[in-house]
């Protein structure tokens, strides 16, 4: 296999012939990300890592999930506050967050799953889970709604503030809910 030289510059190869003769591939330098940029990163666990690295380098990143007040006696949101792993692994779940933000759909009050309690071990054995966000769980429908609203507020604030949107995708199966045609977030 022939060696290819990669060159970052302000000007791309004007012709394919130039690449063939020089074996140099010139890629443009995009200067979209600046120290004062506001970046919204959503998607797979890679988006979590990107948010962490950008924040370490002084970039203002959104959503600011770690700012969500957590009450583990009432609800759980991912692994917050230790890790901001609010992940969305497929395009349907990500699209639904943007649709929710733009008012295209609103989650119904009774749109949740009753699941076996493996979090608090309550006497009734059930807790309530948001089908559209991974590991958002409440002890009651009311505490689940509070958790859903807190995640929505953080997500919406990020969408309003951001200048750059970065979306990452995971590789996962997609589950469409029969009752309303929406897609669950694993």
Language-model features: locations:
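Extracellular glycan-modifying ectodomains
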Residues: 1-186
């Amino acid at each position: 296999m022939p060696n290819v030289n990669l060159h970052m510059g302000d000007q791309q190869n004007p012709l394919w012939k130039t690449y063939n003769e020089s074996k140099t591939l010139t890629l443009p330098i995009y200067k979209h990300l600046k120290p004062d940029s506001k970046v919204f990163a959503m998607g797979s666990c890679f988006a979590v890592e990107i948010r962490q690295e950008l924040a370490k380098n002084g970039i203002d990143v959104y959503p600011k999930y770690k700012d969500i007040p957590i009450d583990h006696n009432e609800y759980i949101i991912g692994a917050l506050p230790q890790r901001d792993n609010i992940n969305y692994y497929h395009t349907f779940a990500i699209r639904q967050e943007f649709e929710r933000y733009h008012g295209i759909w609103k989650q119904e009050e009774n749109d949740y799953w009753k699941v076996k309690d493996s979090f608090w071990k309550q006497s009734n054995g059930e807790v309530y889970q948001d089908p559209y966000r991974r590991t958002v769980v409440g002890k009651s429908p009311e505490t689940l709604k509070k958790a859903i609203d807190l995640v929505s507020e953080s997500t919406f604030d990020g969408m309003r503030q951001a200048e750059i949107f970065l979306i990452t995708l995971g590789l996962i199966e997609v589950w469409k809910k029969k009752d309303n045609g929406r897609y669950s977030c694993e």
